[in-house]
Amino acid sequence: MAVHAVVVDVMLKPEILDPQGSAVSNALPSLGFEPARSLRIGKHVELELEAEDEQAALAQAERMAETLLANPVIEDYSVRLA
């Protein structure tokens, strides 16, 4: 088995309010930055997985995202090789 680097990105679904993103967006002007038109906060997870091949590593990361890394009711996620 080989080690494969995989990335899982998790974001709130567009229709879900993002209070953390709103707080950061509102703070930008007070720090001297131009306001952002849109700002949303998510998670970026980097994994090194032992698997037979890249497809098996992606499938394993997909299962991890579905069951633990993301809440599919309110979050979307993507899985890719690093």
Language-model features, listed with the residues they occupy:
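Long, contiguous binding/interaction regions
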Residues: 1-82
